Swiss-Prot record:
Transmembrane feature ranges: none
Disulfide bridges in this chain: C24-C122, C52-C162
One Gene Ontology MF term: type I interferon receptor binding
Pfam families, A to Z: Interferon (PF00143)
InterPro entries for the chain: 4_helix_cytokine-like_core, Interferon_alpha/beta/delta
Species of the source: Bos taurus
Protein name from the UniProt record: Interferon alpha-D
Example GO BP: type I interferon-mediated signaling pathway
Length: 189
């Protein structure tokens, strides 16, 4: 009987390693929600990107904040939280509801809200570890400034459909990069 329990325990530990990320225990639903968010962001597209070429802009995407090799786990979780929170805020504006399908936005906000809950719990867990490094605000600040530039751009373009398409593409890029960051830390664990 003991070998059977040992095998079950080993399988449980292996499966936990496969679904946990960043050293904290995010539920399997978190990775499913991340994929769901990217799918929903794709589905929100209402305008052909080629018709909005004149609206493209360089928002100085903070690639280093999302892909830096010096980022510690707690810092990475903080950056992931920032990206998710700002994506949630953008999807909750009146302008987004005017341009995008409300039922898709509701689904997107639900998925983002679940991720925020998971990340907040994970951040508390990582910050509570003895010897955890103090968070450097540089990466989180870079993400906040990036999303601020997106918000200013929307205001400047008067929340036009093309402006929202450009922002949607930028948010997808940020979210994809945050997913890649999460995967990188999961592989290290």
């Amino acid at each position: 009987m003991a070998p059977a329990w040992s095998l079950l325990l080993a399988l449980l530990l292996l499966s936990c390693n496969a679904i946990c990320s960043l050293g904290c225990h995010l539920p399997h639903s978190h990775s499913l929600a991340k994929r769901r968010v990217l799918t929903l962001l794709r589905q929100l597209r209402r305008v052909s990107p080629s018709s909005c070429l004149q609206d493209r802009n360089d928002f100085a995407f903070p690639q280093e904040a999302l892909g830096g090799s010096q980022l510690q786990k707690a810092q990475a979780i903080s950056v992931l939280h920032e990206v998710t929170q700002h994506t949630f805020q953008l999807s909750s504006t009146e302008g987004s509801a005017a341009v995008w399908d409300e039922s898709l936005l509701d689904k997107l906000r639900t998925a983002l809200d679940q991720q925020l809950t998971d990340l907040q719990a994970c951040l508390r867990q990582e910050e509570g570890l003895p010897g955890a490094p103090l968070l450097k605000e540089d990466s989180s600040l870079a993400v906040r400034k990036y999303f601020h530039r997106l918000t200013l751009y929307l205001q400047e373009k008067r929340h036009s459909p093309c402006a929202w398409e450009v922002v949607r593409a930028q948010v997808m890029r940020a979210f994809s990069s945050s997913t890649n960051l999460q995967e990188r830390f999961r592989r290290k664990d």
